[in-house]
């Protein structure tokens, strides 16, 4: 929101001093994290993407996720099943290894109650067999090592053990090497070696870590322990390119350590690391890791990886990142009120000349989009299976970003019916985009088909919270398209859907409040639109689409909409419609809802600008119906006195008055939360009541009528003084620089001259005269 207070030092006088206090937001303005407003529609996935989740494009340092890969744990459980017998349930193995408290397991063993405590657990049953005693002893040692040397704190665990628990720490003379060598079984030998290796790592015995890894995990082996051991080994090596190379091997071979790998990876050593790679596959992985943290255009890396490994999983993921970047750079400024991408670069100055920067960046981004699109089209036929469907979906999405709807539709239809569920979901999003751009949005069949597309994504959101952002983005675009087609009601409800989805999993805890139901319509709706909205609210036989857009968005009380309708009518100077609407509502509505009782509590016929703070009374029972009725009555009287009262009233319903909430639902001296959610409302507010809200046009008109009609010197003095006030605040309604003020300084006018000459003997003059006021005519 543009500032509404002149930055220059303005002369003021104590009796007329306006104290602008922020009533709904901080003066410095409302801000949210860039990631919150970022748009993203593309979320197609290939099998294996799960471990890459933290590296999706994001304005945050890493992409937030509610899910963690359990693939490595599953592999470990399968290894135990293969070793101890196929009759073991891997879920039972998981319970013991990853879900059972160490204290609970050790206590049960010491009390000889393992079989009772873990009844029907096939893994425990197998461990208790006499032939498997060595494996049970290993589990006991592994559980013991889950504790650190610090009493009461578990090692690598969020939980806390009981204060009276004996942690059974390793004795100082415990010999890992002896334990490893005495194990005749290779399976156990490797597992003891891994326990020792990890123990040495935290004890900072780096040489022992490297030695154990080279001794027990260097040979070809499919055990999941190998990449785990290699991870600790890499972190104990001082040669940074070699450390990078080993970390890249870990990254490629397991899921659990992918996030940790990128946290420890040493950047800007690309060439040195690549020199250690043994084949194209390894080189492609190193290049992929380097690209996963790059927020800038990176088609160069994608092309290089494609040449090395055309069907690479990482190649697909990086293509998706590029699509998400372009969505951010193009869609986020287009569909959000913030107006800039979530990620900006220091070379781009969005603040000096926003329009120029936006146009230049849009043109640059479109050129890059087409370069990426043409590359993907050129390689599409050389790919196959899941990779081909993924690239096809990416091409389609790029077409939609570029507003090439027909081309987007063409590639969407080329996605195989056998594509995985994630790509099918992406296809539904893209079919929804086609419908929004090309179909008759008023057609019931079209709307219900849109509901089907929307719902297909909704059904997946509980298992992947990342889809909340896709729904937020889809509904925001859908809202814009319905608005462009003239359907403000649907646009508003979809906009609210978008805001709810943007709250993500926390939306269940946030109950909509009064203004959230009407905020969009306050900015965009006409009286007719509100009538249509109320009709939809009352409709009993809603279509599936209507039920969907109304769910969680429609106001529970029709009087919310009536209040807005009456307010819009008042802004439009339709007092009769405003009265009709307000009078149909419960007359205690403004005492029980929103913030009316807090901000509509002063006499609207006493100009706030003429009152000292201590003179103001906040016990006025404001009733909108009665207020409008009074205005209608005063207009009919059309006397000097009635026009003076009308002028006072219109002054007070302006931005400067004590009854501004009669005209607007929020007041701020800077950007507010409502501006962030619904857009800057300044231009709309400038039009309220023919410019009265900021420029006091109607107030001045009635003061001039009162001055002209009155025969009473005191009334004329009051009218003259207030005309001066209207002129003064009208002059400073817009942001004025010192240079502009010098070229066009404020001039008091004849009304103030008359106030100090013709009316200087009136009670009004004696009450409000002061040196600062007189300085305007000296």
Model-derived features: where do they sit?
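Bacterial N-terminal signal peptides that target proteins for export
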Residues: 2-13
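Extracytoplasmic/secretory-pathway proteins
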Residues: 26-181, 186-198, 203-778
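N-terminal signal peptide c-region/cleavage motif recognized by signal peptidases
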Residues: 22-24
């Amino acid at each position: 929101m543009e500032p509404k207070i002149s930055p220059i030092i303005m002369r003021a006088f104590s009796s007329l001093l306006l104290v602008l206090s922020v009533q709904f937001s901080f003066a410095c303005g409302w801000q949210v994290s860039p990631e919150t407003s970022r748009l993203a529609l593309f979320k197609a996935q290939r099998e294996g993407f799960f471990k890459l989740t933290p590296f999706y494009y994001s304005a945050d340092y890493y992409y937030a996720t509610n899910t963690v890969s359990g693939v490595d744990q599953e592999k470990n459980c399968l290894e135990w099943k293969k070793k101890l017998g196929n009759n073991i349930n891997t879920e039972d193995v998981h319970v013991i290894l990853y879900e059972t408290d160490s204290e609970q397991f050790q206590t049960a063993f010491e009390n000889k109650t393992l079989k009772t405590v873990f009844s029907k657990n096939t893994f425990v049953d197998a461990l208790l067999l006499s032939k498997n005693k060595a494996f049970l002893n290993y589990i006991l040692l592994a559980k013991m090592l889950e504790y650190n040397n610090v009493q009461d704190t578990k090692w690598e665990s969020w939980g806390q053990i009981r204060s009276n628990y004996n942690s059974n720490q390793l004795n100082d003379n415990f010999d890992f090497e002896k334990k490893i060598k005495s194990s005749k079984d290779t399976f156990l030998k490797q597992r003891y070696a891994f326990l020792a290796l990890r123990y040495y790592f935290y004890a900072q015995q780096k040489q022992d870590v490297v030695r154990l890894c080279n001794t027990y995990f260097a040979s070809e082996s499919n055990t999941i322990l190998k990449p785990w051991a290699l991870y600790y080994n890499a972190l104990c090596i001082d040669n940074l390119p070699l450390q990078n190379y080993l970390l890249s091997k870990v990254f490629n071979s397991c899921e659990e350590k992918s996030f940790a790998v990128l946290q420890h990876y040493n950047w800007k050593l690309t060439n040195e690391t690549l020199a250690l790679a043994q084949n194209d596959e390894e080189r492609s992985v190193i290049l992929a890791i380097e690209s996963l943290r790059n927020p800038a255009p990176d088609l160069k890396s994608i092309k290089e990886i494609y040449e090395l490994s055309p069907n690479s999983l990482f190649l697909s993921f990086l293509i998706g990142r590029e699509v998400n970047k372009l969505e951010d750079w193009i869609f986020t400024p287009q569909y959000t009120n913030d107006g800039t991408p979530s990620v900006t670069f220091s070379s781009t100055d969005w603040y000096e000349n926003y329009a120029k920067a936006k146009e230049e960046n849009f043109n640059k981004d479109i050129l890059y989009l087409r370069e990426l699109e043409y590359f993907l089209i050129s390689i599409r036929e050389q790919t196959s299976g899941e990779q081909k469907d993924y690239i096809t979906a990416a091409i389609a999405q790029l077409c939609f970003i570029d507003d090439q709807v027909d081309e987007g539709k063409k590639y969407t239809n080329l996605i195989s019916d056998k594509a995985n569920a994630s790509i099918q979901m992406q296809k539904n999003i893209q079919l929804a985009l086609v419908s929004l751009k090309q179909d008759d949005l008023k057609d019931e069949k079209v709307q219900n088909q849109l509901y089907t597309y929307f719902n297909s994504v909704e059904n997946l959101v509980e298992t992947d919270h990342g889809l909340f952002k896709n729904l937020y983005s889809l509904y925001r675009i859908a809202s814009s398209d319905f608005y462009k087609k003239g359907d403000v009601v649907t646009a508003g409800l979809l906009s609210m859907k978008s805001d709810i989805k943007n709250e993500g999993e926390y939306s269940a805890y946030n109950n909509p409040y009064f203004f959230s139901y009407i905020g969009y319509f306050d900015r965009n709706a006409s009286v007719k639109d509100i009538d249509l909205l109320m009709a939809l609210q009352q409709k009993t036989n809603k279509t599936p689409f209507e039920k969907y857009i109304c769910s969680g968005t429609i106001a529970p009380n029709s009087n919310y909409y009536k209040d807005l309708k009456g307010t819009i009518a008042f802004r439009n100077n339709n007092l009769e419609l405003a009265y009709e609407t307000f009078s149909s509502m419960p007359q205690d509505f403004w005492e029980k809802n929103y913030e009316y009782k807090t901000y509509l509590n002063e006499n609207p016929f006493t100009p706030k600008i003429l009152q000292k703070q201590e003179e103001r009374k906040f016990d006025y029972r404001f009733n909108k119906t009665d207020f409008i009725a009074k205005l209608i009555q005063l207009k009919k009287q059309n006397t000097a006195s009635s026009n003076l009262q009308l002028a006072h009233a219109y002054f007070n319903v302006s931005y400067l008055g004590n009854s501004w909430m009669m005209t607007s639902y929020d007041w701020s001296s800077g950007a507010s939360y409502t501006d962030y959610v619904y857009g800057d409302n300044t231009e709309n507010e400038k039009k309220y009541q023919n410019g009265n809200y900021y420029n006091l046009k109607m107030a001045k008109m009635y003061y001039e009528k009162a001055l002209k009609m009155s025969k009473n010197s005191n009334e004329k003095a009051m009218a003259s003084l207030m005309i001066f006030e209207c002129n003064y605040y009208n002059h400073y309604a817009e942001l004025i620089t010192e240079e502009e003020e010098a070229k066009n300084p404020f001039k008091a006018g004849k009304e103030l001259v008359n106030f100090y000459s013709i009316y200087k003997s009136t009670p009004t003059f004696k009450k409000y005269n002061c040196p600062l006021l007189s300085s305007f005519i000296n």
